[in-house]
Amino acid sequence: MPPVPLRTATFSTHTCARIVVVCCLLLALGVSSAAQQLPQRDNEKLLAPTPPMGWNSWDSYGENITEAQVRATAEWMAKHLKPYGWQYVVIDEGWYLANPGAKPADLKFVMDDSGRFLPDPSRYPSSVDGAGFKPLADYIHSLGLKFGIHIMRGIPREAVARNLRIAMSPYRASEAAIEDDTCPWNAFMYGVQPAPSGQAYYNSISTLYAQWGVDFIKADCIADHPYKADEMRMLALSIRYTERDIVLSVSPGPTSLEHAKEVSDYAEMWRISDDFWDHWGPLADKPWSQGIRAQFDTAAKWASFHVPGRWPDADMLPLGHFPHPGDGGEARDTHLTHDEQLTMMNLWCIFQSPLIVGGDLPTADDWTTKLLTNPEVIAVDQHASGRKPVVTNETDVVWTSKPEDGRGYYVAVFNLSEKDQTLTYDWTKLELPKATYSVRDLWSAKDLGDATSLMVKLRPHASALYWVVARP
């Protein structure tokens, strides 16, 4: 497909001047030293003061989603989920492919004359004539929501083969690329040099995304296998200098705890596991796929990490229906039982993971909708602190956290076994002060009365979520 012309970006004189200044600094100092400390935002504004909540297209559509489907999803979210805090609509991988699903050697890309991917106009008709994602982003913003896209780290190999000039710079694509560095599962990108030429390319794409009105970037092949700190810094720096508030999410997992400080300097959220899908235990035919049981162990490793506005990400919530599943196969509903779906929600919320739904929203049934619209459960994810596991056995796990207002505790109890269990805990066993506590079930929104200890009857893979407050 021939390159698509791009409308000229319009920025304030101040913004253009800042972009020029940063490029000059990078030329003088080198990327590695200049990018170690990102320039501060005004008043150190947190772009994600609470865990981001939204929807991502991958679980439902893989690379095959269309503009019509994105718009329908945004409309459903605005009507049903927005009042509960859900706000991001994110298009995952492949929006620039003219032939999604083709063999890797046959993939056809849509890009401009500066080597920047553009939406495929056959699937995103509002992007014609170089409009890019701006019309779609404008529509999503008109609904009171925010718009996000997935990118692969690096620069397109096709841009390097054609040696295209990088926008707003004296460099060409071949000067920015590391041609022996490709992503293990998507080889159509080259890594980018930790040098002014590489920074120039990241500046060029972030400038374009800011022009479109992007609010969220999910950057892939950067957080683990392989971990690319230099490219993460360059991307974060380029986003900062657009002067647009853009949340940065990095993938895939498992992000190493050794990199926690560095990653949290540059991204608002990062994946803690391999791709999470709708199963309990490991799958022999998909060893890369993380199930719920393993996610308990992964979350526990990150429990002590607490940085304001930075969120370890347990991955998307595979709920509801998948018309074109991102993990392959025919259209299907989630494989998780109702008990397992509740357990997933309870773990994500008590852990305070970002909540990013993966299922198809316009076809969501009443059960799925209710899972996503319980304000008391959502508050556990959004408005708590001090999350930690206090019981970690092979058969049962308990987490606690404290509500934002300091009144009482949230307690999540999980049966990890394959049989019914009656679990009893003294409050002190849960690291709570010895007292009589009033107990409220957050899913049923019912007060259960006072208790001197906690007793819970749970089916296999089931869980419960409570708010408990000590009596005077």
Regions found by a protein language model. Give the residues of each.
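Glycan-recognition surfaces
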Residues: 177-180, 191-194, 200, 245-360
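C-terminal beta-strand-rich structural cap/linker in extracellular carbohydrate-active enzymes
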Residues: 450-472
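Bacterial N-terminal signal peptides
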Residues: 19-30
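Structural recognition of the beta-strand scaffold that forms the well-ordered cores
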Residues: 52-57, 87-92, 97, 146-151, ...
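Carbohydrate-binding surface patches
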Residues: 342, 348-351, 356-358, 392-432
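Aromatic-lined carbohydrate-binding/catalytic grooves of carbohydrate-active enzymes
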Residues: 77-221
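N-terminal module-boundary/linker segments of secreted carbohydrate-active enzymes
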Residues: 36-71, 76
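Catalytic cores of secreted or luminal carbohydrate-active enzymes
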Residues: 343-391
